Amino acid sequence: MKTLIFTLSSLQLIFLPQLSLGNYLLDEILHLSDVDQQQLSAVTRITNASNYFGFDLYNTLKGSGNVLISPYSLSCAMAMVYLGSRGVTEREMHSVLNYGSFGLTRDDVRLGFQQAINTLTSNTIGYTLDTANALLIQRSFEVQEDFRQKIETDFGAEVREVDFQSQTTIVQQAINTWTAHKTQNNIQNILKEPPDSNTLLFFLNAVYFKGFWETTFDPKQSTIMKFYNNGSVSTDTVMMMMESRLPFGYVESLNCLALEMPYQGRNVTMLLLLPVSPNGLPELEQALSPASISLIYSTLRKRRVKVFIPKFKLEEEYEEVLKEGLSDMGMKSLFGFNANLNGITEDTGLYVTTVVHKTSIEVDEEGTVASAASGVGGGWRSATPRFMANHPFLFFIRHSETGAVLFMGRVSQL
């Protein structure tokens, strides 16, 4: 028996101020005063667990080249599986997903994601955020009714019986049509190929984000400049330029420049981290943690800064390397015959064979996703500091009210 988990995070950003990444701030907690305290505690802890899981996973995937993952998207898909896990499989997932570190029970996970999903998809002034959750089951496969109800109620997911064995093309078309509908046609052809005919469970989480910058780039200012791939080999790229008052700072302990780029509505922000040294990204990655992000925000001060960000598009897909990474992190039994998913079905022999995570980002004068830079010929000490994204940098896109990191990644080569 096979189980396929598929998470797609599709991101297109359009370039339009000032939020924080990391733990909740007091005003953010007060802003959620209409939420039951138990639910508030759960959503706070579930987003923290998701963010820490994202950092842990990033460290297993970073290798070389570009990286782009959605901690929220993948955590959401894995949480649906977790709710159906039992025994050793449950304990392993509980640990790897950082639920234990934040004292999250099974009910906390349900309540946390339920509230996070509701908050993420409401009050989206100035940006678009569409999510889609689904669980497709082989028709001959009986799902526990209690599990079905929790997935539908808490994750807003649709649970459907399909025939993977003889109607894979029809299933592919149905998934693509459904996802396009749920994301207002922003995500199309999510499956390029039909699912494996041996698939019994198909978990899908899709996220689409499109944000407008509060302060826009002028396309007339864009020019061809050098970007140093992997910190050394130069290539010509279109560099967008602007001068504006933005949260900016130098983080001495990390030897990097930090810039915060807000979107309209002030509920989503991008944090860019640029090593001062063109070859300093490995050291920055090694020193960085969710806790250090809070330190970074404490160093930011709103000031006039010259910003240079490359225009680019990233598309990444993780399959075997993701499965290996999760296994190395301690999620071992889930991917073998010893998996215990009795919360999904009473049948034995069900395990996960494939985990797929697809992400995409597009950056242009109207939108952004990843940009960072360190000034060659300029820096944080000048009268008007420069943030010159002409060598590898990191970025984080985060929803302030829930604290969820929607996307995080690295631009290493263009």
From Swiss-Prot:
Molecular function GO labels: serine-type endopeptidase inhibitor activity
Sequence intervals crossing the membrane: none
Listed Pfam families: Serpin (PF00079)
SMART domains on file: SERPIN
UniProt subcellular location: Secreted
Matches recorded under InterPro entries: Serpin_CS, Serpin_dom, Serpin_fam, Serpin_sf, Serpin_sf_1, Serpin_sf_2
GO biological-process terms attached to the record: negative regulation of serine-type endopeptidase activity
SUPFAM superfamilies xrefs: Serpins
Keywords: Glycoprotein, Protease inhibitor, Secreted, Serine protease inhibitor, Signal
A Gene Ontology term for the protein's cellular component: extracellular space
Post-translational modification: N-glycosylated.
Tissue localization of expression: Specifically expressed in hemocytes (at protein level).
Glycan-carrying positions: 48, 230, 267
Site description Reactive bond, residues in chain: 381-382
Signal peptide: 1-22
Oligomer status and interactors: Monomer. Forms a covalent heterodimer with clotting factor G subunit beta chain B.
Family: Belongs to the serpin family.
Function according to Swiss-Prot or TrEMBL: Serine protease inhibitor that inhibits clotting factor G and to a lesser extent proclotting enzyme and clotting factor C.
The name this protein goes by in its record: Intracellular coagulation inhibitor 3
Source organism of this protein record: Tachypleus tridentatus
